[in-house]
A protein has these predicted regions:
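Membrane-proximal helix-loop-helix units in multi-pass membrane proteins
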Residues: 97-162
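N-terminal first transmembrane alpha-helix
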Residues: 1-112, 204-216, 222, 226-231
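Alpha-helical membrane-embedding segments
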Residues: 71-79, 151-174, 178, 185
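Juxtamembrane/interfacial segments around transmembrane helices
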Residues: 59-70, 141-158, 226-237
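Transmembrane alpha-helical segments of multi-pass membrane proteins
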Residues: 83-106, 120-129, 170-184
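Detector for Asparagine
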Residues: 3, 37, 52, 137, ...
Length: 237
């Protein structure tokens, strides 16, 4: 599937873009939303002009991408979700995940309805917790995980045109993950759009969006750390 890389993005973002467009329409056309009438060009969406459709599609994709930010953190720091890692340090893992969830839920509880507060608290708390766990560990586990993964995948890469058991296995779990990503993005869009629709004002909504995507920015730090460690400790030739 490496030669059809675009299929990954089509699977991952097409449905999310459609749901994102619906979310944008909901947020701007719902009288109870803080974004009601924010986009004047959508007031007469029933005309379905090319400009309106293009604008909604573009905003839908942007909303989809923002909503999917927690998935990037999960993907980058997934080494800390392995059973062997959790079993080795259960208390540290629990503290790094539960404390941010409790704090995030408590803060959101003041401004959002309970269902939205709990949903956002769990997503954002897990998001921050994994990023913090990776930083406190100085990315050691992530470095080991990616090195082991690269070593395991190397034979399959050299035989990429062959239907080897390893290639079939990798293709299978990638398909599963990408379809899972698509549905997880939809779930995150529902949570985020509900939270934004029930937010007290646009200022809080902006803060919520910043907090929602902030831990995902740590992926740049993780990538840079892996690059630096590869330069210092390259794979044997």
């Amino acid at each position: 599937m490496e030669n059809r890389w675009w299929e990954y993005y089509a699977i991952r973002y097409f449905l999310g873009t459609v749901i994102g467009a619906c979310s944008i329409l909901f947020l701007t056309l719902d009288p109870d939303s803080p974004f009601f009438n924010s986009l004047t060009t959508l007031k007469e969406f029933k005309d379905a002009t090319f400009l309106n459709v293009s604008l909604v599609a573009a905003l839908g994709f942007a909303f989809c991408y923002i909503a999917s930010a927690p998935i990037l953190t999960l993907h980058a720091a997934r080494a800390h979700l392995r059973y062997s890692v959790i079993k080795t340090s259960p208390y540290a893992t629990s503290a790094c995940l539960l404390l941010p969830i409790i704090i995030s839920s408590g803060l959101c509880w003041v401004y959002l309805p309970p269902p939205a507060a709990m949903s956002v608290g769990i997503v954002v708390g897990t998001h921050f917790g994994l990023a913090a766990r990776a930083c406190l560990n100085k990315f050691v586990l992530i470095d080991i995980f990616y090195r082991d993964l690269a070593t395991a995948r190397a034979p399959s890469t050299s035989d990429s045109e062959k239907n080897t058991p390893s290639n079939e296995f990798i293709t299978s779990y990638r398909h599963l993950r990408e379809h899972g990503n698509a549905f997880l993005i939809v779930l995150l869009e529902i949570i985020l759009s509900y939270a934004l629709a029930t937010a007290p004002n646009q200022v809080f909504s902006l803060i919520l969006i910043v907090v929602w995507i902030l831990p995902a920015a740590s992926a740049w730090t993780i990538g840079s750390a892996l690059e630096s460690r590869l330069a210092s400790n390259p794979f044997p030739k």
